[in-house]
Amino acid sequence: MSAAAYMDFVAAQCLVSISNRAAVPEHGGAPEAERLRLPEREVTKEHGDPGDTWKDYCTLVTIAKSLLDLNKYRPIQTPSVCSDSLESPDEDIGSDSDVTTESGSSPSHSPEERQDSGSAPSPLSLLHSGVASKGKHASEKRHKCPYSGCGKVYGKSSHLKAHYRVHTGERPFPCTWPDCLKKFSRSDELTRHYRTHTGEKQFRCPLCEKRFMRSDHLTKHARRHTVFHPSMIKRSKKALACPL
């Protein structure tokens, strides 16, 4: 027997021996590998005849191949699950998979959660987020003018009421200055008009000494200064509202 054949013979003997120890019958039934086990006396006997040695070698190799084929079809045992790891019915009811929004879609995760999970957002989730943002933007301006042919929409009902007076011609804010019969549809228009009688100019330029009756006139003037910034007017308004 050559060296390579002898090594195969020894490996086959080891494989058969391991299979005989591992194949413990369950429920009293002998597995198929038990039927293919070679008797101990045939494995351990001295091989004086070369023909017998070659025969035993071929038998062991055949059994080893059969055992390898059986291992391919051996069912994988599922690991036992402890009772502590089972989810309770309450946890199952409160899982995220059962929660749906009013539109019928699953709640979207925050960008931090998507970044931690390492998965890119799906196109469907991006579509839902886009629809939600559009719906939020539309809800900000939900007061539509009911007048025929006018499609203007406002975020506040008071702004809509003031605009609707343009269609009806209503002017509920009359000027109280003596001999002045003007009326206005908005209170801010009346306030600006009233300053024409009093000469009040409460809007002062923060970069010079000029004053104006209207804030838009002040802004238009202040932009002519090279060092002007819109925050300057905001600070001047706060100082005027809260004098020291």
Swiss-Prot record:
GO molecular function: DNA binding; DNA-binding transcription activator activity, RNA polymerase II-specific; DNA-binding transcription factor activity; RNA polymerase II transcription regulatory region sequence-specific DNA binding; zinc ion binding
Modified residues (Phosphoserine): 122
Zinc fingers (C2H2-type) by residue: 143-167, 173-197, 203-225
Positions of region (Disordered): 26-51, 79-143
Annotated Pfam families: zf-C2H2
Entry keywords, A to Z: Biological rhythms, DNA-binding, Metal-binding, Nucleus, Phosphoprotein, Repeat, Transcription, Transcription regulation, Zinc, Zinc-finger
Cross-referenced InterPro entries: Znf_C2H2_sf, Znf_C2H2_type
Biological process according to GO: cellular response to cortisol stimulus; embryo implantation; negative regulation of keratinocyte proliferation; positive regulation of transcription by RNA polymerase II; progesterone receptor signaling pathway; regulation of DNA-templated transcription; rhythmic process
Keyword Zinc-finger: yes
GO cellular-component term (any): nucleus
Cellular location(s): Nucleus
Ranges of biased composition (kind: Basic and acidic residues): 32-51
Organism domain of life: Eukaryota
Stretches with biased composition (Basic residues): 134-143
Subunit structure: Interacts with ZZEF1.
PANTHER family: KRUEPPEL-LIKE FACTOR 9 (PTHR23235:SF132), KRUEPPEL-LIKE TRANSCRIPTION FACTOR (PTHR23235)
Family: Belongs to the Sp1 C2H2-type zinc-finger protein family.
Function: Transcription factor that binds to GC box promoter elements. Selectively activates mRNA synthesis from genes containing tandem repeats of GC boxes but represses genes with a single GC box. Acts as an epidermal circadian transcription factor regulating keratinocyte proliferation.
Protein name: Krueppel-like factor 9
Organism: Mus musculus
